């Protein structure tokens, strides 16, 4: 069994008192309990808003303004919302176990109108674990949350896999989705459907018996049978159209003769005048064309002379302009020659200064070396003098010490002290604290050896210093050379840069050696380039004169072609006279041939008109008389085949009509006798029981019942056994099935379903195998589907039958036309077209005249061509020897390439000239740059340190030697030896002092002399540097001046400049000569143009006079042609055979037709006036207006629904074919379309019976409903007495009123209305038309009266009215009615929705406290039995044993209003479980 869909929960977001509240809805009854203002109505309003989000309907009564005249604009919704985004969402589970969340986003709109913006949406595929409040809120912290906007909600759901979010722009789409998913019971297609649904919800919400629903129960419970109404409307429309068409045919038949007469006479009248004007116009135009031809010839000659004048003037202007430019170029070439000469003189000065600078550079380098050597020697002298000074000072100090000792008493104590002092000094200097006089000698040897070692190391360092000083000087010299060439650079890069410079120097010298050969090569190429440019100029001038561009390869062939042209032009002059004579002879022959053809043309044109009519009618092209006769035989065969096919299609169409009539029977009975038998037996046709089966199930049930699908279901077979005896008026096989027609099912047979087939076990030994029919007709849907396909087939067959009938008659008329053509025109129709031959001959004649007229001009042109050819040959003779230069496309590139190479070579020469000496000096010393002698300073430091070490070692050795020498001072016995030792030492010191002073004197003298020499060398170096800098600056100035001149001063520059000047002088002379020639030719051309202008003026005067005469005579011709083409009558008026008649013959023809037309249009005022106006010979366009008026008059009288053209001539042809066929066909169609009144009555009666049975089934569900004193509720459906009488008359007494239904002036609806008025004269119909009343009578719902009755106490069955019932009884009765409506909607919508869906059922009840406990229990029982959900509200808790109860209390905390909610489950023992997040009634907890 299919589970019914349920509403799971209701969620309110940001409503007044509810920020984020979800109410879990019970499967049966959910109760909202609370005092006034607790939020019960707000909760229900949120549910209703989500269910029906239509602001035009929503109106919550408890906010209606008392005493207001127009009601509240708010309608109760604006005040229930908080500012910002609000939501109301319904969480549902449908029969397919799909979770669907539907809801609306609400937002207050700022303004006085207190409007609310509503956006419906739906969410599918949401997991069960996700709560609705989680979707639309975002938690900010433990106590704060934020409501998401609709866009944020969509983005959030898009991130969830499998979840679909849909936003709806219309309420219809929103409700359509809810219907398809089983949330609502009825498809709400329109605002009217939504209004019905809202009224039902509103009636449920506020309780009681709703008068709005009870008054219109027919609309709520009875479905509209739109198919029947549409069928009647289509039938009446078809009948009306047929009658109108038949009437039009009759009118058209009377107009046929008038059409023929008017068309024939009007055509002769207008066409004769039209062709006469056309002939006259052609004659006048030929004369005007002759004048215009001469005029154009003269203009062409004048234009040629003007073109020639313009060309010569342009060429003269070019030469004038070229002369100015050539003069400027010549002056520029002269100036350039002067600049080259100046540059050459400047170059000579530069070369002299460069030689002087090179000599100064050598002397400067030599002087630098001398100064450097003198500076080194000066440093050595200074060092030597400083050393001598130090030695003298030391010796003087020592000598002073000994002298002081000698001045004191030579006592032992002094000596002893001196010895002790010497020993202490030795210990200090030698760092020997343990030194004793006894060990001093040993230590003296050691320190003397150390002194010797230090002296040797010092000598070695002196040698290294000398070598390093030399290397340092060489490195600095090489580094300075590299820096001078390359510029500033790091010392570490000197080696790599030096090698690169040396390699580059080799390349630069190599390039510098190529300067002179390159200059010679460049001079040669520049000469060839100038020759090439001259050749290009000659070629451009030649192409300009020839008016065409030529390739170089084409010049030789062109030369030969021009020579051949010269030869041919000379030959063509001799043949000119013979050609002229031949052309004149041919012209005379053409004239005689044209006259003969013009006599034969009218006969041939008449035959062609007839042949073209035949071709248009049959769609074939005929090229011979044999084809015409063969096609006539084919027509006879085609006519026989068409007649046979027409009869076959007609038979098939009749069969389809019969099948449609059989399937259209009410109840699905294919045999009318079955309906009568069903009424006789008190049964129902099986097809009527299954009338509502869907199209998908129709094949199954058709195969299930097989041949018994047309059986009659009767309550008891035993009761009809006697009636079967003697039964003859019945089908051959009559099937009877016992069963209750009101609750019949398919359990009659044991059946096994196979693939597209069933096996029915009729008995133990009898099975029936039936396949599903491909075209089932079981059930109304299947029959309607089959009828629809049959109607489509019938339309095709009808169209085919009409086409074949038309073809048959058309073929017969075509056969007659062919017979007439063969008898009259077959002999001449297939001859050659004489007009085409005339046109061809006229064209040839015009060509001959043109050839004769242009013969003389051809000779002149040939002479001009001869001169041009000779001039071209002369130019080519100058060009051909230079073709090789023109073909050399790389010459300019090679000049540029050589120029670039020469620039590079000159740059290399300048580099070698500037840095050659430095590179030569750098090459032998470049190897010293490999290692940077920057260690020279370190070596100097090492030398100073070694010198200090040697000095220290010497002092230590001297101190030890003094101790050793003073060993005697330590002994008192050695004083004499000590004095003698002191005397010797003093003498040695004096000798050394004298030597040192002498050495110092010599060093000082050498230092002074060498300093003077160094100063002299430095002065010479400064003088050389000053001279070098001065000459270098002068050289730079000269080079800048040379660069400013901007001329390359080489050996051939002067010669090239002079040659260029001479060439320009020659061009200037040639240009002046050509200019003089053009001025003379231009004067001659102007004189010729003046003569032609005078001639042209005379021709223009003659031509304009003739043209003015043509225009004056034919002023209206353009209007005539425009009118003819705009109205499309040119084909009718331009009759070519009339072109060969004379003007008098055409006038006579037109006058005869005019007389006939006056009689024909005497009764038509409009045509008579137009004809009178057309008789004016000066206004030919009025005749066209008359012809158009005749055609328009006839066209307006053509019925477009009958005749398939707007051309009256073609209409006459179609009339002959269509009239009889359409008359017969439409008459038969009207008879078939007409429906009998008995059938109408049967259809309406069967429909009423079916709906009564359905209401009876609905009443069964309400038998046990009781509220208070009300024991039961039922719905009565009765047929109105007046309408029942109408049905009886239609089915039994229709013969008495055939005057209504057989009238051609009344439609069936109007006849039905007239019958109703005839039967009920006492009823006032008001202002309604019979058509409107008849359409209402075709709706079965207008035949029924419906009312609700209750069985109350001792009163029995009473009509349910609010005044007769208590409040609780009215609420219960109203709820019962609403349940019946909902169930009816579900039954009605079952065919529109999937069979696997059972929709949700939910109703509301506000103020439910007015019901007693028994009524509440009845409601619970009703909800459980009908699987319906109910939401009720009461000020007090009614404490039901079943369902869910929410206790609502509105509180205010810190100026914030919220509703406190406690949820309770029913306390019945069978439902012990609690709500999620709540507790049992004994321990209630607050619902979050």
UniProtKB/Swiss-Prot annotation:
Q: Which GO terms describe its cellular component?
A: cytoplasm; nucleoid
**Region described as Disordered: spans on this chain:** 1049-1074
Q: Which GO terms describe its molecular function?
A: ATP binding; DNA binding
Gene Ontology biological process terms from the UniProt entry = cell division; chromosome condensation; chromosome segregation; DNA replication
UniProt-annotated stretches for the region Flexible hinge: 666-783
Compositional bias (Basic and acidic residues): 1051-1065
Q: Which keywords, in A-to-Z order, does the entry hold?
A: ATP-binding, Cell cycle, Cell division, Chromosome partition, Coiled coil, Cytoplasm, DNA condensation, DNA-binding, Nucleotide-binding
Residue ranges of coiled coil: 326-418, 444-472, 509-602, 835-923, 977-1116, 1209-1265
The entry marks the following residues as binding ATP, namely: 34-41
Question: Its domain of life?
Answer: Bacteria
Protein location: Cytoplasm, Nucleoid
Looking up HAMAP family in the UniProt record yields:
MukB
Which family is it part of?
Answer: Belongs to the SMC family. MukB subfamily.
The role this protein plays is: Plays a central role in chromosome condensation, segregation and cell cycle progression. Functions as a homodimer, which is essential for chromosome partition. Involved in negative DNA supercoiling in vivo, and by this means organize and compact chromosomes. May achieve or facilitate chromosome segregation by condensation DNA from both sides of a centrally located replisome during cell division.
**Comment, domains:** The hinge domain, which separates the large intramolecular coiled coil regions, allows the homodimerization, forming a V-shaped homodimer.
Assembly and partners are described as: Homodimerization via its hinge domain. Binds to DNA via its C-terminal region. Interacts, and probably forms a ternary complex, with MukE and MukF via its C-terminal region. The complex formation is stimulated by calcium or magnesium. Interacts with tubulin-related protein FtsZ.
Protein name, UniProt field: Chromosome partition protein MukB
Organism equals Salmonella typhimurium (strain LT2 / SGSC1412 / ATCC 700720)
